[in-house]
Amino acid sequence: MLKEFREFAMKGNVVDLAVGIIIGAAFGAIVSSLVGDIIMPLIGAITGGLDFSNYFTGLSSAVTATNLADAKKQGAVLAWGNFLTLTLNFLIVAFVLFVVIRFMNRLKRNDAEKPAPKPNPEQELLTEIRDILKTMRR
């Protein structure tokens, strides 16, 4: 049973999947930083210093706080600014994946379109000898 598991775990697809998950997690952190630390502050600067991640709507009259963390302690809130930030994060990840997959497909297509290399003179001679030997055996 251990041998079967080792064979399964060492198959190319499983290892590729594990590497992809690890790289994806690291890439997710980079995109989160890009959105949270660069894009959203730029959008905030353009819109007059607004911080979208701190926008919320309280669902009860008990919510009187002015920042999201304190508002969550007071009661239920719709954290729509955080949702907006995460949606932008998702769109960036989806776009980057689209570009990467498109690039990979283009590379595969270029490899498939390349003609087979011409055989060298030795290979042609060996092929002729093989064909002659086949006809002689008949």
Swiss-Prot record:
What is known about what this protein does?
Channel that opens in response to stretch forces in the membrane lipid bilayer. May participate in the regulation of osmotic pressure changes within the cell.
Q: Where is the signal peptide?
A: none
Enumerate the GO terms in the molecular function aspect.
Answer: mechanosensitive monoatomic ion channel activity
Instruction: Give me the Gene Ontology terms describing cellular component.
Output: plasma membrane
Q: Which domain of life is it from?
A: Bacteria
Q: What is this protein called?
A: Large-conductance mechanosensitive channel
UniProt keyword annotation of RNA-binding present: no
Q: What membrane topology is annotated for this entry? A: Multi-pass membrane protein
Give the UniProt keywords, A-Z: Cell inner membrane, Cell membrane, Ion channel, Ion transport, Membrane, Transmembrane, Transmembrane helix, Transport
Q: Where are the transmembrane segments?
A: 19-39, 81-101
Q: How does it assemble?
A: Homopentamer.
